Amino acid sequence: MALNLRKNHPLLKTINDALIDLPTPSNISTWWNFGSLLGICLVTQIVTGLLLAMHYTADTSLAFNSVAHMCRNVQFGWLIRNLHANGASFFFICIYLHIGRGIYYGSYLNKETWNIGVILLLTLMATAFVGYVLPWGQMSFWGATVITNLFSAIPYIGQTLVEWAWGGFSVDNPTLTRFFALHFLLPFVIAGLTLVHLTFLHETGSNNPLGIPADCDKIPFHPYYSTKDILGFALMLILLISLALFSPNMLGDPENFTPANPLATPPHIKPEWYFLFAYAILRSIPNKLGGVLALAASVLVLFLFPLLHKSKQRSMTFRPLSQILFWTLVANLLVLTWVGSQPVEHPFIIIGQLASISYFTIILVLFPLAAVLENKMLKL
């Protein structure tokens, strides 16, 4: 009998077990597409980023002009830059939907996969933040100043830590060069963590919309889900290319068309849209350390989901109370995102504070309470 190379070759069999013969639940919906879409985002960002890095100069006197030169004089430089800038937005859209899916269907009960996923989110946020500083526009500079300054709220070592991160007494050339180094490095860290994430996922297999074991009814990944993934790729890439070609600056900040000036502060300092929810939570507490702790908690709270799961059912598919809370949480995050983009004045201050309180209340109090109540109602 001929040797089946796909199943016996040391390297090919790993790929085969992950992408071809992987046993997959037969009923996973389009919400399960976002993992592979994140993979495509990562590859796109690394490729476009590498091409941009070939023309970028990490120096305060040259950075802004090097980006302008790229868009004007490099073949398709404008397109590569627009794809990279908007690709970051799609990366976050996909990861937020992916996390939302995980919460709704109880995927967080695969604890190792979930924890690596949260670490991936934190790494992605760090990568996006340091990358945003590189074009050295006004909002790049002041965003870097404001966010790095938050570390000075850490008692005793805070100020030393910030000056160590800056490489001086303010955001300047050393800061820019180290941010470029980090922005180059971190995507490869993300790629490595992704492999760990998949390794843990393939230990248990995928969850499914019913939240029940599906071992009795598995189908091979290829051709079924490989085809389904390609459809997802096409749809996302159409949206990304449309955004990059028709309105590339829609999600950016107009302040970044002005070179960084340490002597002029923009009227409203705000991060990119994908950080606005966390920024709103940070601003809702009128104390520096308290705000920083709330900011950290807004993302780190994801680590607690496996511990807060009190329901006898895994997924929310048949749990209407939890569903109502889930969609309230989604609406709440949209409100936080909107408030984060508004100036610090009445009524936005109180709206932000109420939305921040309800964010933590829903996750830490109401989700477990609803689960216990549903167990009682169903006599489980």
Curated annotation (Swiss-Prot):
Binding, a ubiquinone: 202
Chain residues that bind heme b b562: 84, 183
Tree of life domain: Eukaryota
Required cofactor names: heme b
GO MF annotations in UniProt: metal ion binding; ubiquinol-cytochrome-c reductase activity
Subunit structure: The cytochrome bc1 complex contains 11 subunits: 3 respiratory subunits (MT-CYB, CYC1 and UQCRFS1), 2 core proteins (UQCRC1 and UQCRC2) and 6 low-molecular weight proteins (UQCRH/QCR6, UQCRB/QCR7, UQCRQ/QCR8, UQCR10/QCR9, UQCR11/QCR10 and a cleavage product of UQCRFS1). This cytochrome bc1 complex then forms a dimer.
PANTHER family, sorted: CYTOCHROME B
Record protein name field: Cytochrome b
Lineage: Eukaryota, Metazoa, Chordata, Craniata, Vertebrata
